[in-house]
């Protein structure tokens, strides 16, 4: 079943709703577009900062970043707007899968990105909630230099 006859109030992440077939095709496309926009915004900021990066054709990672020391994996999580005073991101990953080296949390309405390491405790097992003030910090260089 692709869609429901009655609209439902979304109380869980869009990824979960899509997985169980509760999103219409239009909602799934909109969710995919939000995610793609976040990926391109994150990679453009990295490129402008002088890092060589590319999108990844992988289900485990969204991109790769080349630093002087090594190639890092990137996971981009995108939220289109603030909800309940926080930005909410679906951060559950599959059993046995390795987390990416770097996470980029994108707030599309602010056009701002919060970067953190994949082993940072701020990333919760299922859903990560970030306040808007975290997006005012310049975290990209700090996080990427921590791998050198």
Protein language model annotation of sequence segments:
Residues 1-59, 66-148:
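Mixed-charge (Asp/Glu-Lys/Arg
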